[in-house]
Amino acid sequence: MAMSNNTPSTQDILHWLIQWGEDHDAVRAMLLTSSKANPNASVDIFSDYDVVLVVPDIHPFYEDRTWLLDFGEVLVVYWDPIYPMPGYGIEQFANVIQYADGLKIDFTLWPVELFRQIAQAPVLPADLDIGYTVLLDKDHLTDGMRAPTHTAYIPTPPTNETYQKVVEDFFSDAPYVAKCLWRDELLPAKWCLDYDMKHLFLRPMLEWRMEIDHRWSVPAGNLGKGLKKRLPPEIWAQLEDTYAGAAIADNWEALYRTLTLFRRVAMDVADHLSYAYPLDLDQRVTAYVQEMQHLEPGGVNRRPIR
């Protein structure tokens, strides 16, 4: 089946899900979560449906997976293993289903026992606090449940300790990237530069910088997908310039541009929060990386590079 140009409306799909839940006795409650339940989120034709199914026993749904076919022809599916929910210790699982007609549903299955505890908790889990809509509740399980605040995943100001750790960890990766580039080892260099340095350390710094302009009130989005809309355009342009193709020389330039951008943004954050940016660490690591780049193969450095 090809992706359909006549995609059913959101209300049609929700009606379909509710009817399916009503027809299956094991489904005691059903909740819609994430972007389609958050009035502050933007949605488009590719926005998926995040659905929580509350059932007496999750194992039959895990072991016999034919129920997924009730919603259409499955193109591809990913299954999480069954694992205990952090903070509760009760088993749950989730799956991600892309249907051939374009519909995408992410199901999370919670046993009734787990959901009762969540519904009665003083604080909602982030996945519910970001937004939820009760689609079906056969046993009044959601009675008295807290309303979502839609504030989950909004970054908060880092402590000085957290800020300094992000800066130190970012610069600790730079010599490794340089070593891989010097050795013409593209894959580990790109992994460390484009994932480790950028997503683990530069992205949080960019999110903090974004929040400075928005008074710590807006979510950055999963993997920073909201940054382009909310960062100053010149900072976003600098970020784009940190991405390179496969040429080693271009990746050396990308590394230096990443260092420059991080320095700029981290200094902005430090100034706003009255923290001290470790400029000495920055300068020493940058100089060391430059020295690594210009080593001749087989050359001897003042200190061995392993």
Question: Where do the PLM segments sit?
Answer:
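Short aromatic-enriched loop/helix-cap "lid" or pocket-rim segments at secondary-structure transitions
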Residues: 43-45, 118-121, 220
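Conserved nucleotidyltransferase catalytic core and NTase-mimicking acidic/glycine-rich helix/loop elements
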Residues: 153-306
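Conserved NTP/Mg2+-binding pocket subregion across the NTase superfamily
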Residues: 2-6, 71-188, 193-194, 294, ...
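Short alpha-helical segments and helix-capping/turn motifs at coil-helix boundaries
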Residues: 14-16, 35-37, 90-93
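Helical scaffold of the NTase/Pol beta-like nucleotidyltransferase catalytic core
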Residues: 1-32
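Short secondary-structure boundary/capping segments within folded domains
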Residues: 19-23, 40-45, 96-97
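Catalytic metal-binding acidic patch
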Residues: 33-68, 72
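Short, solvent-exposed loop/turn segments at secondary-structure junctions
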Residues: 37-38, 58, 112-114, 211
